[in-house]
Every structure is written in C-alpha cells, then in structure tokens.
Amino acid sequence: MERELRRPNPINSSRRPEIFSSGGSSTQLPESPRGPMEFLSRSWSVSALEVSRALHTAKSASATNRPPSSINTPIPEETLNPEKEECPPENSTSVSSQFSFAASATSQLVLERIMSQSEVSPLTSGRLSHSSGPLNGGGSFTETDSPPISPSDEFDDVIKYFRTHNTIHPLFSGTGGSRGTTGNGSNTPMAGTGPKTVGRWLKDRKEKKKEETRTQNAQVHAAVSVAAVASAVAAVAAATAASSPGKNEQMARIDMAMASAAALVAAQCVEAAEIMGADRDHLTSVVSSAVNVKSHDDIVTLTAAAATALRGAATLKARALKEVWNIAAVLPAEKGASSALCGQVDTKHSDSSFSGELPVAGEDFLGVCNQELLAKGTELLKRTRGGELHWKIVSVYINKAGQAVLKMKSKHVGGTFTKKKKHMVLEVRKDIPAWAGRDLFNGDKHHYFGLKTETKRVIEFECRNQREYEIWTQGVSRLLAIAAEKKQKSSMSKWMAP
C-alpha cells in the first residue's frame, strides 16, 4: 500500500495543511499553530515590530492620500473597527461574556499605568549587585553568563582560604601533603588525603558563584515572564472595560473594577521583577510587547513561556540545594583515617555564613549528612537550669580524642563578644516534656530533647518541627555510637599490641 506525503511549498506564503492519502482516502492533519511563533518573533525583535508598523503606516497613508505625521499617524490597530477586535461571539445574546483585545492607544495607557508605579518606588533602584547577565533588550539572555571575577574578589577569596585553614605554612612546606583540614578549621593528620590548593579552592568558588549567578538570572527571567502575563491580562481587562457601551451599568462597573485590579497586580509584578534585578529597559520592552496581545495565541504563548521559566528557575534552585545537601560527609572510618572529625566539612562550604535552619532532603538524608550538619551547627532555643530561654548556636562533633563534644556559642553586645561552652556528650534524652508556656507559640509543632553531659547535667533544647527533632536526636545518637566504636577499637588495638 503506497502512502503519499504532500507538503506545502515553503516559499508559498499561503498555509496548506499536510494531507496523507492512502487507498483513495485522505486524512487532513491539523495546522501547526503559527500564531505563537509570530508573537514570539514580534516580542524578541523590537526592530522588526517597528518596521512592520512603519510599512503599515505607509500603506494607510497612501490609501487615504494624507501626508504622514510622526505624531498623529494612526497605527494599524487603531484604524480597525473596535468591534472587530473582540473575539467572535458564539452566542450573540451573551454580550457580557466577551473579551476584547486592546487597541494601541489602550495598550499605551495600560503600559504607562503599569510602569509608572515602579518608577516612584524607592525599592526599585536598579539591579542587584550580585545579579548579572544581559537582561536588557535584545533577547540575548543566557543562563550561563556570569561576570568576570575582579582581582579584589580573588584576593578576598585567598584571605578567606588562609583564614579557613588558619595557616599558610602547609601550602609551601613539603609536609603539608599528608595533612587534611577538618571541620573545625584545625589541621589534623589524614591518611591518604592532602590539602586543597589555593588554585583548586578558587576554582571551586568561581564555579559556585557561576551557579549562583545562573540561578539568580533564571529567577529574574521567571519574574519578568510572570510580569508579562499579568500585563497581558491587564490589557485585555482594560479593553473589555472600554468596549462596554452595550452592557448594563452593573456589568460595566464589574469590568472597570476588574481592569483596575488587573492593572494593580501587573504593576506589583513588574515592581517585584525590578526588585529582583531585572533591567528596567528590558522590562519596559517586555511589558510593551505583552500589552499588545491580539489573539488567544499570544496569551497562551506568554503563559507557556512563564510556566517554563518558573519551572527552569525551580530546577536550578533545587540543583543548588542538592549540591549543598550532597557535601562530602564520608565517615573517617570509611576513609581509613586514624583520627579526624566525624563531621568533616567541605572547604568550599566552610566559609558560608550561618543560616539558622537545617536543610532537609530525602529519606536517606539522616544517614548521610547528619554528621556534617551537626558539626556546622544551627540555632536552637536552650533552657537554663533557672528556666530562662536563650538562643544558642549549637553544634556537636567528635574531637581528636574520639569523644562527642557539644559546643554552644552565643553573641553579646551586638556580636562584639562571643562566648563558647563545650561539654562532653554521654547520652541523648528524648523524653523531655514540653516547656511551660511554649504552647502559646505554635506549641503543637515544637519538640524537645536533652543532652546528658559529663557533669550528669541534662541540657534541654527546643526544635522547631519534627524533622529538625529527628535530625538532632538521631544524628547525635549516631555520633555517640561512632565514638563508642572508635573507643572499642582503640582499646582492642592496645590489648593486641605486644
């Protein structure tokens, strides 16, 4: 059975659907939606849009035999009958259910109203200092663009590297190749591991900054896309309200209220995008293209583009969080080291500031990354023996002697003075009752645990939720088990020694 495929001539401008013929019967395939592509080409290239308008203006001027004017020359959309801009009604009786597409004059008014609110906002003072990438007009946005790192930034990175490792001697001495850097910043002998060089450390920091810039650009692009959708909705709402002579007074008021609300939402979306770092010229160009939607294909295209941008930004953000969660947290026993901190922290994350919250990943998170998270520490509410409550930066790790250590740090006088206290942890208490009066502050979500120290004292802490409670109780329990195993192996090796 022969099958003939007839395709339209690409040179011919007329649209002809593809037809498959088989056995004398033909099947007509649906036409490809070219409207969205036409709108995208119009929105990507402002110059093409201006050329198209100029050609239409010249044709209309020659048809009416009137001299062209740079001020009063009507744009083709304005010369159309306003009634023709409405969607063709399926039911002529339901006039109130029709939506209209704005003419150029209405689109310009909507554009000015949307952009005028962000002009006077004190928050939109330009792009963020850490945002980069060509987010200006021209559509040359790429997620991989990043600014070159200045020499001053590299110098600061080197200083941070030296401060992290507390010394520069291992970098130039021959004995530094057999030493590793532990999570608390001290140098501890590591079997088969060497220090990370300055070049490697700087390269990791550059890659990290590039990923952060890429994520930031994706979020800005998503915000601009959402602002474009909101602007298109505002333009359609304004056109619908303007073309309501045949409606009753009640429906006209509803249309006006909807137009005002849509313009407000669009203005706030534009302002939010500019606060996130979007370039104002690029934002104006995008909104100007969005308010000139002429068909349902244009709105569908804007919506699909915004949804895709949001999904891409969410993917990059999830990737960044996954990289944070997958920091090297391999146990020293698994690496064959004789003594090292169990909660070893990767050097590329050792200079990160304290966030106050523990990141949470999948179900295997507790068994893989708890040691590092506990070594880095987080902010917990601690109750003293007198019943007072204080916020402490709490961390638990295994020291060189193989003991589980609880470290509590607090800042005083605006961070001028810092106090640190350390205790040896012997046991985890999970049967701590709820503190009196804490039920008034989301008490149903709070959980409590205690750590028994070498002085037989139980220090109580409050967790914000069940997940944080499991991280601390199970993580410290695992640290205690590892410390006991190391102690047992040490005693066995001493007993077996001649």
From Swiss-Prot:
Pfam families: Auxin_canalis (PF05703), PH_2 (PF08458). One of its GO terms (biological process) is auxin-activated signaling pathway. Coiled coil: none annotated. It comes from the Eukaryota. InterPro entries: PH_pln, VAB, VAN3-bd-like_auxin_canal. Residues 201-214 have a biased composition (Basic and acidic residues). Disulfide bonds: none annotated. Residues 59-73, 122-134 have a biased composition (Polar residues). Residues 1-38, 55-95, 122-153, 172-219 are annotated as: Disordered. Residues 174-183 have a biased composition (Gly residues). Interacts with VAN3. PANTHER family: EXPRESSED PROTEIN, VAN3-BINDING PROTEIN. This is VAN3-binding protein. The gene is VAB.
